Curated annotation (Swiss-Prot):
Species whose genome carries this gene: Pseudomonas entomophila (strain L48)
Full protein name: Glutamate 5-kinase
EC number: 2.7.2.11
NCBIfam families referenced in this protein's UniProt entry, alphabetically: proB
Similarity remark: Belongs to the glutamate 5-kinase family.
Length: 372
């Protein structure tokens, strides 16, 4: 299984705040230099590399003399705007010592939710990688709001892995990987070396929250691995304190937790759909519709929907769930929530008489639907 790591040609590497700062007292240039040495070695070994870097808020906090992470959005955004400049300058300086160039990419969820902007971002990233430049990606914290933020850089890294069709997502953290129990409380806890990303048993052991400087705990890392798996990427959750960890991963050493996708890579449009995190409503399906989606790759017809929840417009993302509340799929609605309310439970040939017009016979077409 570790051959999936050694043979991976396109890596997305996410480095958390705790691994880039000196106990919250500003950026640790020495630590960053060590990371750069390893990433340069990967590039010289033929690996295409994209870096998702946390640390902007932590760097800004240090510059402002703050000792604890603020909760107010405006204060977080102020810290991020100050720290982002220092963070990117530090990466550029360190990579420059090895003759490598970096490029700053700041993303918001809107950039990936809009199909045209998604394709533009993908084209830019691919061009940078082809030029041998290392893209340094972060969330654009200065403009996002709670409603449109990714939530953490683990999730952002997974979406970037989808965007660039990466073979491997490496999430570097302050833990050695995922354990079968909390190692802070249980000395008998064992590292989980390999598992399927969709294994439900992992949910029980992924408890806990992020550290003082970051937002992402182990649950968000597991969620990120599952998101990356939708585009066929493997994910390694691994301790960033392990000496020369990237070098050793490339050499095939059995470190960290390797989470593998169940299925192969989704088609490009399906990858974009899978990356949608902002959903606007929910469709509750009957058992027949659930079976049709899961087993026959069918479109979702109005007759198979029992309930419409939320408020959404035509073309917005909705979640499809069974009557037990379990998510089955997500897709783009052909009708608004108000229109859907009028046609659910009815055959498609009744749509025109119910609405006065018929846009599509499906509530969600299979080309705009992705199973989860």
């Amino acid at each position: 299984m570790r051959s999936k790591v050694t043979g991976a040609q396109r890596w997305v590497v996410k480095i958390g705040s705790a691994l880039l700062t000196a106990d919250g007292k500003g950026l640790d240039r020495g630590a960053m230099a060590v990371w750069v040495e390893q990433m340069v070695a990967l590039r010289e070994a033929g690996v295409e590399l994209v870096l998702v870097s946390s640390g902007a808020v932590a760097a800004g906090m240090s510059q402002l003399g703050w000792t604890s992470r603020p909760s107010a959005m405006n204060e977080l955004q102020a810290a991020a705007s100050i720290g982002q400049m220092r963070l990117v300058q530090a990466w550029e300086s360190s990579f420059g010592e090895h003759g490598k160039h970096t490029a700053q990419i700041l993303l918001t969820h809107d950039d990936l939710s809009d199909r045209k902007r998604y394709l533009n971002a993908r084209s830019t990233l691919r061009t940078l990688v082809d030029l041998g430049v290392v893209p340094v990606i972060n969330e654009n914290d200065t403009v996002v709001t709670d409603e449109i933020r990714f939530g953490d850089n683990d999730t952002l890294a997974a979406l970037v892995a989808n965007l660039v069709e990466a073979d491997l997502l490496v999430i570097l953290t302050d833990r050695d990987g995922m354990f079968d129990a909390d190692p802070r409380n249980n000395p008998e806890a064992q590292l989980i070396y390999e598992a399927r990303a969709d294994d439900p048993a992992l949910d029980a052991v992924a408890g806990g929250t992020g550290g003082a400087l970051g937002r992402g705990g182990m649950q968000t890392k597991l969620r990120a691995a599952r998101l990356a798996a939708r585009s066929g990427a493997h994910t390694i959750i691994i301790g960033g304190r392990i000496e020369r960890v990237l070098d050793r991963l490339k050499a095939g050493e059995r470190l960290g937790t390797l989470l593998s996708p169940e299925r192969g890579m989704l088609a490009a449009r399906k990858q974009w759909l899978a990356g949608h995190l902002q959903t606007r409503g929910t469709l509750v399906l009957d058992d027949g519709a659930v079976k049709a989606l899961r087993e026959s790759n069918k479109s979702l017809l109005p007759v198979g929907v029992k309930t419409v929840q939320g408020s959404f417009r035509r073309g917005e993302m909705v979640v499809c769930v069974g009557q037990d509340g379990h998510e089955i799929a997500r897709g783009l609605a052909n009708y608004s929530a108000l229109e859907a309310q009028k046609i659910i439970g009815q055959p498609s040939d009744a749509i025109e008489s119910l609405l006065g017009y018929s846009a599509e016979p499906e509530l969600v077409h299979r080309d705009n639907l992705v199973l989860v």
